[in-house]
């Protein structure tokens, strides 16, 4: 078990830069116990037993806030429920996205025949909303294939929301580079999705907190 890239810490909260490939919380099985929560508890033994208030997919990198105290956990959880926490992501999408900006609204749910994939279902699915803006088209990799750099602002927090909104034909129709579930990524490829801004109200001081951390791609 390794350490953490700590962006900010005080007596109430900690903000970390989660690397791609690391779980946010423990999963089932001995091989899924190394995660952000486990590392926080190892470094700070006096913190809550369950400090997590939100998650990033294992394949997604970026900013994650956790609570050290029960009061901070309760306050941050309420902020997430009321959608008072604002997050923005940057991603590289396969190919050239023709439009410059827009809003995606799609309903989806677990695909029981192909977990952990989600599938589009406007009847039984939960609706997710994402605002997006094209940053630029750029060459990527050794072959210099064209990809589109996109900023995402999810207004809801559904599982795989940005990945499905990117890949599905009713969304952008361009999977995120490196996506093994919804795109053409291989088992060794990195998902090019990074949570680069995080805004919330400090649970103890009431101060507006804003963190920005650019991706490494």
PLM feature segments, named:
Residues 1-217:
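RNA pseudouridine synthases
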């Amino acid at each position: 078990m390794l350490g953490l890239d700590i962006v900010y810490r005080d007596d109430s909260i900690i903000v970390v830069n989660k690397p791609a490939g690391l779980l946010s919380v423990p999963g089932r099985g001995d091989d899924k116990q190394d995660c952000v929560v486990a590392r926080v508890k190892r470094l700070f033994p006096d913190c809550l037993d369950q400090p997590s208030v939100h998650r990033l997919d294992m394949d997604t990198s970026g900013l994650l806030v956790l609570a050290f105290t029960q009061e901070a956990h309760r306050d941050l959880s309420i902020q997430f429920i009321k959608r008072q926490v604002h997050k923005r992501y940057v991603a590289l999408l396969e190919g050239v996205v023709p439009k410059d900006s827009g809003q995606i609204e799609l309903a989806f749910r677990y695909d029981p025949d192909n977990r952990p994939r989600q599938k589009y279902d406007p009847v039984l699915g939960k609706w997710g909303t994402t605002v997006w803006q094209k940053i630029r088209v750029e060459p990527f990799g050794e072959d210099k294939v064209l990809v589109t750099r996109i900023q995402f602002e999810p207004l809801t927090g559904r599982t795989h929301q940005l990945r499905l909104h990117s890949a599905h034909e009713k969304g952008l129709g361009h999977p995120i580079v490196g996506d093994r579930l919804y795109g053409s990524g291989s088992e060794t490829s990195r998902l090019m999705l990074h949570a680069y801004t995080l805004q919330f109200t400090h649970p103890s001081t009431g101060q507006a907190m804003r963190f920005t951390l650019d991706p490494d791609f």
